[in-house]
C-alpha cells in the first residue's frame, strides 16, 4: 500500500470510529430519555454543543445529557450548562457521570435545593473531597443516609457535608458519631436547648477539659456512651 493510500485508509478508519462514538452517545440519550422527533433533535444538538467544547468522549456526554434531562427536566442552554458541570465533576473526582447525577439529584431533592445551585453543590463536594481525601461517592452516601437526622438537628446541607467529611478525615466512625449526635438532640430537647446551643457548650467544655477522662465524661453526658468516644475524637 502506498503512503497516500495508507493515509486515506487511516482517515477513513478514524472517521468511522468518530461516527461510531457519536452514534453511541446519541443511542445513550435515547435509552435514558426515550425522546423522539424534535425533542430528540434538541437533545442531540445539546450533546453536540457540549462535546464540541470539552475533551470528553461522546458516550460520557450522552450519559450526562440523558441523565440531566431526565432528572432535572432541563433543555437547551440550561441542560448544556448543567451537563458540563457534571462531566467536569465526574472527571475531576474520578466518578461515573451517571452515578454522580443520580446521587446529587437525590441529595438536592432531599434538601429541597434549587437546580440553580447545582454548580455550587458540586463545587462544595469536590472541595471537601480534596481537603479531606474522602471520595465524593462515599461523602454523598453519608449525607443521603443521614439526611433525616441532619434536618432534625437543624443542620444545613453545607454543614452536613462538612461534618461528614471531617468525620472521615479524622477516622471517626460515622455510624457511632451519628448515634452520639442523635443522643445529643434528645438531651438538648429535654433541657429546652437548641442543638446549636447544646453542641457549642459541649464542644467548648470538651476542648477545655483538663484531662482526657474529664473530656470523655463531658461528652458522655451529651452524646451517650456509644457516641462519646467518637465525638471526643472528632472534636
Model-assigned labels for residue ranges:
Residues 140-143, 225:
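Flexible, solvent-exposed coil segments and beta strand-coil junctions
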